[in-house]
């Protein structure tokens, strides 16, 4: 059930972030991603509270990404990790280039 929940969201979006809105790392990751202007339908924020039981979802995250914590961030079906991984990419000034290369950003 957790696999279906996650895979359905990954199939429909280029950038998907699984969050808990009470989590400060999730809010920080959203702040980074919200600096960019995404094409309609190319970015989805999924609150993991939508799925019960949450531990089953976290077990599935661990199975496919090696981590149970949120945020869990995917570009396409590829996990890029969590907040610290996103921050590292952003600090290298590579995030915009990566997002452009996968075709999720609006062009003026």
Curated annotation (Swiss-Prot):
Its main location: virion. Disulfide bonds join 23-26. SUPFAM superfamilies: Thioredoxin-like. Residues 3-106 form the Glutaredoxin domain. Induction: Expressed in the intermediate phase of the viral replicative cycle. The keyword Repeat does not apply. GO terms for cellular component: virion component. Gene3D superfamilies: Glutaredoxin. It is found in: Virion. The keyword Disulfide bond applies. GO terms for molecular function: glutathione disulfide oxidoreductase activity. Keywords: Disulfide bond, Electron transport, Redox-active center, Transport, Virion. InterPro entries: GLR_AS, GLRX1, Glutaredoxin, Glutaredoxin_euk/vir, Glutaredoxin_subgr, Thioredoxin-like_sf. Pfam families: Glutaredoxin (PF00462). NCBIfam families: GRX_euk (TIGR02180). Has thioltransferase and dehydroascorbate reductase activities. Belongs to the glutaredoxin family. This is Glutaredoxin-1. It comes from Cowpox virus (strain GRI-90 / Grishak) (CPV). The lineage of its organism: Viruses, Varidnaviria, Bamfordvirae, Nucleocytoviricota, Pokkesviricetes.
């Amino acid at each position: 059930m957790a696999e279906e929940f996650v895979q359905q969201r990954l199939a429909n979006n280029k950038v998907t972030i699984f969050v808990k809105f009470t989590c400060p790392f999730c809010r920080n990751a959203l702040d980074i991603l919200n600096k960019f202007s995404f094409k309609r339908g190319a970015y989805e924020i999924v609150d993991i509270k939508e799925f019960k039981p949450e531990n089953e979802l976290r077990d599935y995250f661990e199975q496919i990404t090696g981590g149970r914590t949120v945020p869990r961030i995917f570009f396409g079906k590829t996990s890029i990790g969590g907040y610290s991984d996103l921050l590292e990419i952003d600090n290298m000034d590579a995030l915009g280039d990566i997002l452009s290369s996968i075709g999720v950003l609006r062009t003026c």
